[in-house]
């Protein structure tokens, strides 16, 4: 099941890579603004944290000042996001077949597809939220409390993309209080 899932994700990534390279889809207004930010890195911007600018800076440093450079890490994040959802479903105790479909639905959901094509802040934010959830569920699976430093690392990374990830602390603290008083 895992091999099939990885193959489908690889085919999705290859197809969307081809779309980014050959379809001639120019940068949208938000992407152009984020790209402008990436040329002058800072710790924050008037409406967003710096993660998207740093991500675009890294992509353009590796792949040049092209649409692919701007969008490359978004495609990587979205593929890893679908795989993280698959792992989360497995760790939560779902059957492998159900976990397969969970990951596939994430990969081909509107956010999974649009987030693969365009440099938006939601992809990095959601990847980090899922990583924090995976950390908590894995600890619960072992009948332990999740390490706050690891969860905090995921929250810190997610806060570089969108500030609402700070809400995860509330859920995490409730989880610790209810399951490990």
What are the residue ranges of the model-derived segments?
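Transmembrane-embedded, aromatic-rich helix segments that form part
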Residues: 149-153, 164-179
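Short helix- or helix-capping micro-motifs
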Residues: 9-10, 99-107, 155, 159, ...
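Transmembrane-helix signature of polytopic, membrane-embedded enzymes
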Residues: 85-108, 126-127
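Membrane-interface transmembrane helices that cradle and orient dolichyl/undecaprenyl
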Residues: 90-93, 132-149
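Loop-to-helix entry region of an early transmembrane alpha helix in multi-pass inner-membrane enzymes
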Residues: 50-54, 63-83, 115-119
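Short acidic/glycine- and proline-prone juxtamembrane loop motifs at membrane-interface regions
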Residues: 111-125
